[in-house]
A protein has these predicted regions:
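Short beta-strand/loop motif that positions the catalytic acidic residue
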Residues: 73-74, 79-82, 86
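Active-site nucleophile elbow and catalytic-triad environment of alpha/beta-hydrolase enzymes
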Residues: 52-70
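Hydrolase active-site cap/lid region
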Residues: 5-57
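Alpha/beta-hydrolase-fold serine-hydrolase catalytic core, especially in secreted/extracellular enzymes
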Residues: 120, 132-139
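Hydrophobic residues on the short alpha-helix immediately C-terminal to a glycine-rich phosphate/catalytic loop
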Residues: 2, 6-7, 21, 97, ...
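Conserved alpha/beta-hydrolase "acid-adjacent" motif
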Residues: 87-93, 117-118
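Acidic beta-to-alpha connecting loop that harbors the catalytic carboxylate
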Residues: 84-86, 110-113
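Catalytic histidine-centered segment of alpha/beta-hydrolase-like enzymes
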Residues: 112-123
Length: 139
């Protein structure tokens, strides 16, 4: 979700691939302490002093909306991968983000959960996407 939001605000970003993006962070923004604890437990946030200003950080969660950013990111290339058995972010969220973009390549990896970075099928799809981006942009 963050990559989609960042890409939408940066015109030099030509393409984005995202794993299981939530359409928005509304559920998390209702309980930011839980999000912070979860992010620390899975190693996403490792700095014990983060965030410096918890209230400001928690307020920013209301503005993280991949569904809105996907529409802004179009017509640039967006690929979304989602595990068919994801129990953290519903597959429906990725479908909504893809629909908001209008031309996103949505790949549902059957039998995969939320941790797609450990699924060789998802990594193979991602590497194929990277190759296509390289060659389509002559990088």
């Amino acid at each position: 979700a963050l990559a989609i939001c960042a890409g939408a605000s940066r015109p030099e970003v030509r393409s984005v691939a995202a794993f299981a993006p939530p359409a928005d962070f509304e559920d998390w923004s209702n309980d930011p302490e839980h999000l912070l604890g979860h992010a620390r437990s899975v190693g996403v946030i490792r700095d014990p002093d983060f965030p410096k200003d918890f209230d400001a950080w928690a307020e920013e969660l209301d503005h993280v909306k991949a569904i809105d950013s996907a529409a802004e990111f179009a017509p640039r290339s967006l690929t979304i991968l989602h595990g068919g058995d994801d129990d953290v972010v519903p597959v429906f969220d990725s479908r909504m983000v893809a629909d908001a973009h209008g031309a996103a390549d949505l790949r549902i990896i059957q039998g995969a959960g939320h941790l797609l970075r450990y699924d060789p099928r998802a990594i193979a799809v991602l590497l194929g996407w990277v190759d296509r981006q390289r060659f389509s942009h002559n990088v």
